[in-house]
Amino acid sequence: MSLNGTFSHNNGLPSGEREESETPGGSTSIISSSFLLQPRASDSRPDALEGKYDKNVLARALKKSRDSCLNGALFEKFLPEENYKLSGGTVFSHVRYIDTATLCVGPLRFEDTKFYFVHYSNSPIEPFAKPNISYVNPQWNELDYRPDSQKLSPGKEKNTLDLKHCLLPSPEYKAPPAKKPEDYEASPGEPVEPLITDASLQRLKSRANEDPTIFNILKRISKGLGTPEQCMLLHNELIGPSTFPLPKRAKKPPRKRITLSINQQDKDEFFDSLINNKKEVRRHFDIVMEFSDAPDTKWIFPRESVLSHVFNTDKKKLEALSLLFHVYRPTEDRNVIDVKTEIKIRDFTPTLRSAIELLTSGTHADRLLSEKRRRMSNLEPKYYMQFHEQT
């Protein structure tokens, strides 16, 4: 259940998941703790709920919700040793600190959350640190790393030969010779008759006075806003019919449609992997988080999130990064619950923003996998709060 203020009757709640408290009006408030696992960023603020419901019940609900986030209700735990064993001892994790930001989960705020960038490789050695770009090594890039020649030469002597060998040769650009009027003439020395004459200009002027469409087209072309078709129309009016081929407009590629055939065997394997907590080998790169309330554990940022930017129109700046993702949980009746969850990142730096945008820009195969998991699961069950009047 979410804290969005919509409440109705539900008799399917297990008794072990309810908390009861006596309200001053003599009614009993029953609240299920299952919905507290997945609060959403679109939920109401706590102060909007205080007028309707008991403050103690709301405080306990928010406390339980915060503890569930810290204990792994939303995110997967980052275990580099386990990932190393799953890969057969071939994938190593290299962790680097990015920056801190505020993670918002519904009405909950996790300030000073640390974010790390994890790079997986087959080498146990940390990759090269980025050197300073200077006149000594201006051609450096991450794909073709060439170390400083001074480090390779013995002692403190500067070896100019090694220095020239390290640097890439500077490209030599030769400017093409300027064309002379004779180059455009069929036979040099003879006067060239201009294609645009005074008569054609007068004819175009009279046409523009008669037809306002041509006048508006000329205005757009003079401002540099003319389309290729309008420029060809001007060519036809001044010179005559154009011999150039018509411009071809680029068409958008067809949208990739997700076609999936899911049978019961796929659903059983998906359920067994969740119930047995089977892990997949994580490769390439990840972003992990570390809450200030629980600094001993790191959590993996959801890679299959759908990223959207929240702008503040008054201040004209980017206010938050909103991420929508799915959390899958097994049930006792051999089923999988799909809980759609939304989080927001605030007070972030440009470095963290670029890292999150890089992580969430998944390929079509990633979107296909997430769509398959969503179709193999059921929607989130709704648990609601209800007030019972004593008879």
Swiss-Prot record:
Its main location: nucleus. It is found in: Nucleus; Cytoplasm. GO terms for molecular function: ATP hydrolysis activity. One of its GO terms (cellular component) is Swr1 complex. Keywords: Chromatin regulator, Cytoplasm, Nucleus. Residues 1-13 have a biased composition (Polar residues). It comes from the Eukaryota. Residues 1-27, 170-190 are annotated as: Disordered. GO terms for biological process: chromatin remodeling; transcription initiation-coupled chromatin remodeling. Component of the SWR1 complex which mediates the ATP-dependent exchange of histone H2A for the H2A variant H2A.Z leading to transcriptional regulation of selected genes by chromatin remodeling. Component of the SWR1 chromatin-remodeling complex. Belongs to the SWC3 family. This is SWR1 complex subunit swc3. It comes from Schizosaccharomyces pombe (strain 972 / ATCC 24843).
